[in-house]
Regions:
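Short leucine-rich amphipathic alpha-helices used at interfaces
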Residues: 1, 13, 19-20, 45-46, ...
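Alpha-helix boundary/interfacial micro-motifs
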Residues: 19, 25-27, 42, 47-48, ...
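Short, intrinsically disordered low-complexity segments
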Residues: 30-59, 64
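C-terminal structural segments of small proteins and small subunits
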Residues: 51-87
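Extended, hydrophobic alpha-helical segments
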Residues: 1-41
Length: 87
């Protein structure tokens, strides 16, 4: 499953959330990560993120799509992490 994670997290917790997400997904731009995950991995990510945030102050959205080909991405302005198929 293809996952897109976006977050708005308090200053004291943002570095921990970002550092963790970098271990499981690809950084796209500020507060946005995406990548392919299995169902079990998605559950682990959700569980870990729940320990890192304050649910009274922070917000995380996880968009799940069955396949990346169904995601249509349009960028405006500079792309902070340009993805390329070149090796």
């Amino acid at each position: 499953m293809y996952a897109i994670v976006v977050y708005d997290v308090g200053e004291r917790r943002v570095a921990k959330v970002c550092k963790y997400l970098r271990t499981v997904l690809q950084w796209m731009q500020n507060s946005v990560f995406e990548g392919e995950l299995t169902g079990a991995q998605i559950e682990r990510v959700k569980s870990r993120l729940a320990t890192l945030i304050d649910p009274e102050e922070d917000a995380i959205l996880i968009y799940l799509v069955s396949d990346e080909k169904w995601v249509r991405r349009e960028a405006m302005g500079i792309e902070k992490n340009f993805r390329s198929n070149l090796l």
